[in-house]
Amino acid sequence: MASEFKKKLFWRAVVAEFLAMILFIFISIGSALGFHYPIKSNQTTGAVQDNVKVSLAFGLSIATLAQSVGHISGAHLNPAVTLGLLLSCQISVLRAIMYIIAQCVGAIVATAILSGITSSLPDNSLGLNALAPGVNSGQGLGIEIIGTLQLVLCVLATTDRRRRDLGGSGPLAIGFSVALGHLLAIDYTGCGINPARSFGSSVITHNFQDHWIFWVGPFIGAALAVLIYDFILAPRSSDLTDRVKVWTSGQVEEYDLDADDINSRVEMKPK
């Protein structure tokens, strides 16, 4: 873990997460806040159209940034995704901690910038996640779990280097998954499925009501996605010792893509 801490590539990846998170939050939430303007000038703009625009803004921004910085940091841009990849033994504990810090700080910075730019908007929530009227905490938690589960499951499947059947764009597939999560959850919770995104809005607005839902739900969803994919759908043969080595070293060998049996389980070992 100490050796990884000293590497320039490690810190470059952390900075990439920070900068990409700023762009992601600014673009996606900025798009949502922009609804105040067309609604006033164009009365035909409805809630359904608004939800689609928000969903596309979040999904396409993730796809774009994943393509832009994915080769540098992996473009997690979400603590739930980072937790999922940690539990899947693809990153070290140190990297996970630093990524989550970078993501949260990036979200705060972006939301603060948006707060200044959109200060004239009435009732400006800055994209604050909140339970819709009639939705209780248990229901909101369930929505966040399901929305995040499908996202992390998509990330694990799309980035699985054992697969030879993948075609098209991985970042675009993940972006569509983010958009799908928003289409599902936006009417119930405002769609968190990203604790850092929720945290930034709560910090700047000083509103932490029901905020725990937007951490606990995504983290449970991420853990369930790893359980389903790594232990049921596409299990890997790695014991506890190997997993601990990956968590501490952060270095994982490439999958054996030349294996005769591509359906065989692949063991992940640190270098």
From Swiss-Prot:
A GO biological process of this protein is: cellular homeostasis
**Motif (NPA 2) on chain:** 194-196
Named from the GO MF annotations, one term is: ammonium channel activity
Q: Which residues lie within the membrane without crossing it?
A: 71-84, 189-201
User: Which SUPFAM superfamilies does the record cross-reference, listed alphabetically?
Assistant: Aquaporin-like
Transmembrane ranges? 12-29, 49-67, 93-111, 136-155, 166-183, 209-226
Query: Could you tell me what reaction this enzyme catalyses?
Result: H2O(in) = H2O(out); nitric oxide(out) = nitric oxide(in); CO2(out) = CO2(in); glycerol(in) = glycerol(out)
Q: Which residues are glycosylated?
A: 42
Q: Which residues carry this modification: Phosphoserine?
A: 249, 264
Q: Which InterPro entries match?
A: Aquaporin-like (IPR023271), Aquaporin_1 (IPR023274), Aquaporin_transptr (IPR034294), MIP (IPR000425), MIP_CS (IPR022357)
The entry's cellular-component GO terms read: ankyrin-1 complex; apical part of cell; apical plasma membrane; basal plasma membrane; basolateral plasma membrane; brush border; brush border membrane; dense core granule membrane
Extracellular compartment residues: 30-48, 112-135, 184-188, 202-208
- Give the chief site where it resides: membrane
- Cite the entry's keywords alphabetically: Cell membrane, Glycoprotein, Membrane, Phosphoprotein, Repeat, Transmembrane, Transmembrane helix, Transport
Keyword field contains Transcription? no
Look up and give the membrane topology term.
Multi-pass membrane protein
Kindly report every residue range on the membrane side named Cytoplasmic.
Answer: 1-11, 68-70, 85-92, 156-165, 227-271
Q: How does it assemble?
A: Homotetramer; each monomer provides an independent water pore. Component of the ankyrin-1 complex in the erythrocyte, composed of ANK1, RHCE, RHAG, SLC4A1, EPB42, GYPA, GYPB and AQP1. Interacts with EPHB2; involved in endolymph production in the inner ear. Identified in a complex with STOM. Interacts (via the N-terminal) with ANK1 (via ANK 1-5 repeats). Interacts (via the C-terminal) with EPB42.
What this chain does, per the entry, is described as: Forms a water channel that facilitates the transport of water across cell membranes, playing a crucial role in water homeostasis in various tissues. Could also be permeable to small solutes including hydrogen peroxide, glycerol and gases such as amonnia (NH3), nitric oxide (NO) and carbon dioxide (CO2). Recruited to the ankyrin-1 complex, a multiprotein complex of the erythrocyte membrane, it could be part of a CO2 metabolon, linking facilitated diffusion of CO2 across the membrane, anion exchange of Cl(-)/HCO3(-) and interconversion of dissolved CO2 and carbonic acid in the cytosol.
What is the protein name stated in its UniProt record?
Aquaporin-1
